[in-house]
């Protein structure tokens, strides 16, 4: 058997974290078994589906590197096929027309709720031996309902949750085509999985209740039943269902926030799955190790600190050239153009060990390419009357030296010693004048990257105002 998995999002919004994890697990299982991974866009909700959402899904998949072997297939382009299968079910007695009006169904629901019963369709239009059906009304277009078995149980061995059994008497007759002829979600999913030869359906556990209905439909069609694996939901840091209030939930928002795709993938892989104590691994390793026996059936909890830790690791490991291309774009988006005057890769190398996102690096290094606006409080704190003469003398001495870290440190240390000061008394005001902040890497390293001309110009502009 060739493994065939699928990821089937609805384009009613962005690709969210839960969907991305489902896609990752489906992709990894196909890759592990040298199978095929199919991308299917379930766009039958015409009112809510948008081209922008489709593009966001495709962008998210591509950014993560989750390549698909077939597709993307669009359900709206398969309407003729669905109608053929509906006709087959009607012809074979597995489906029937139901002429209930909305008012009838609402009244039935209200009555059942008053009687403490579970609201469900009562089968009044279901054809059965010896049953007399109501007269067909002239003014009500019918829906098509699937004739769900009345007896027995639907049993499947869920690859994550174990054996699940649902009594058929708990299931009513599912609408598979609306009054306007359009097929419904549960029906389209079944036909697609059948036609595409899906062997393993990996999806969120919010679909567990759909599974018995879909199995019954597949059996009526004489189709092979795929294996099902229902993944637990993802909770936020606070133990509540992950939502926008927990921060970014869109995959592309993580890209915008400065996360690397390999960090996001590594983190998603560990949401509900484990391989011993391994925390950091490549996607090749993940595909090799992946299996359902290591997926927990309990809810996974999102931990932003862990994601940041992983992202920091991958930033440290990434090629500087790759980071430079990305960070240059982030700076450009902020209106800051990177020039050849300052070595961007050298600047990133100076800052990446202290950053957990690319945005942090971009924000920290902006001063290399645009002179900072220095807060008055910093000037007041560090450029004190007693230190200004020292800085003025240091400016003169720095004009004619070799511009290396070693020589800069020597000259700054000389000013410290000559004036019987501690090193920070000189280094901190220098840092403020050059970077606009009292937080930065070693000041001599910053000065080398800024260059002699720019470093002296920044010192001079501050001292001219404050001396």
Curated annotation (Swiss-Prot):
A GO term, aspect molecular function: ATP binding
Chief subcellular location: cytoplasm
Compartments (UniProt record): Cytoplasm
GO biological process, one term: glutamyl-tRNA aminoacylation
Catalyses which reaction(s): tRNA(Glu) + L-glutamate + ATP = L-glutamyl-tRNA(Glu) + AMP + diphosphate
Residues that hold ATP according to the record: 244
Keyword Secreted among UniProt keywords: no
Cellular component, GO annotation: cytosol
Motif ('KMSKS' region): 241-245
UniProt keyword terms in alphabetical order: Aminoacyl-tRNA synthetase, ATP-binding, Cytoplasm, Ligase, Nucleotide-binding, Protein biosynthesis
Documented EC number(s): 6.1.1.17
Sections of the chain in a coiled coil: none
Motif ('HIGH' region): 9-19
Subunit structure: Monomer.
Annotated function: Catalyzes the attachment of glutamate to tRNA(Glu) in a two-step reaction: glutamate is first activated by ATP to form Glu-AMP and then transferred to the acceptor end of tRNA(Glu).
Protein family membership: Belongs to the class-I aminoacyl-tRNA synthetase family. Glutamate--tRNA ligase type 1 subfamily.
Protein name: Glutamate--tRNA ligase
Organism taxonomic ancestry: Bacteria, Pseudomonadati, Pseudomonadota, Betaproteobacteria, Nitrosomonadales
């Amino acid at each position: 058997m060739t493994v065939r998995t699928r990821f089937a999002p609805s384009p009613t919004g962005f690709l969210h974290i839960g969907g991305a994890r489902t896609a990752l697990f489906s992709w990894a299982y196909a890759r592990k078994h040298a199978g095929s991974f199919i991308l299917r866009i379930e766009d039958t909700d015409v009112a809510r589906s948008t081209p922008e959402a489709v593009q966001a899904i495709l962008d998210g998949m591509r950014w993560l590197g989750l390549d698909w072997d077939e597709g993307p297939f669009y359900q709206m382009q398969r309407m003729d096929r669905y109608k053929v299968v509906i006709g087959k079910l009607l012809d074979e007695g597995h489906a029937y027309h139901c002429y209930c009006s909305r008012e009838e169904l609402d009244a039935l629901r209200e009555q059942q709720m008053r009687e403490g019963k579970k609201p469900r369709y009562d089968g009044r239009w279901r054809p059965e031996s010896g049953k007399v059906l109501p007269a067909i009304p002239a003014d009500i277009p019918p829906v098509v309902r699937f004739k769900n078995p009345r007896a027995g149980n639907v049993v499947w061995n869920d690859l994550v949750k174990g054996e699940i059994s649902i009594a058929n008497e708990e299931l009513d007759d599912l609408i598979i085509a609306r009054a306007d002829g359009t097929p419904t979600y549960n029906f389209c999913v079944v036909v697609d999985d059948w036609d595409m030869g899906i062997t393993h359906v990996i999806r969120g556990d919010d679909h567990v209740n759909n599974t018995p209905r879909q199995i019954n439909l597949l059996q009526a069609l004489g189709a092979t039943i795929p294996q099902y694996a229902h993944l637990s939901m993802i909770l936020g840091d606070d133990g509540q269902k992950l939502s926008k209030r927990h921060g970014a939930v869109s995959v592309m928002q993580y890209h915008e926030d400065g996360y690397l795709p390999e960090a996001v993938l590594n983190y998603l892989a560990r949401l509900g799955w484990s391989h011993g104590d391994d925390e950091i691994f490549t996607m090749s390793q993940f595909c090799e190790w992946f299996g359902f026996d290591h997926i927990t059936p309990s809810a996974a909890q999102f931990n932003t600190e862990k994601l940041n830790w992983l992202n920091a690791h991958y930033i440290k490991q990434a090629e500087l050239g790759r980071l430079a291309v990305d960070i240059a774009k982030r700076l450009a988006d902020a209106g800051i153009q990177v020039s050849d005057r300052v070595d961007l890769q050298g600047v990133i190398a100076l800052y990446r060990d202290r950053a957990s996102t690319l945005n942090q690096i971009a924000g920290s290094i902006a001063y290399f390419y645009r002179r900072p606006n220095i807060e008055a409080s910093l000037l007041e704190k560090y450029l004190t009357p007693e230190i200004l003469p020292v800085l003025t003398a240091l400016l003169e001495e720095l004009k004619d030296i070799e511009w290396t870290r070693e020589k800069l440190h020597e000259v700054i240390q000389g000013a410290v010693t000559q004036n019987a000061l501690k090193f920070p008394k000189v280094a901190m005001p220098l840092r403020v004048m050059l970077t606009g902040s009292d937080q930065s890497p070693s000041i001599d390293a910053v000065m080398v990257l800024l260059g002699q001309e720019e470093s002296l110009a920044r010192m001079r502009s501050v001292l001219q105002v404050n001396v």
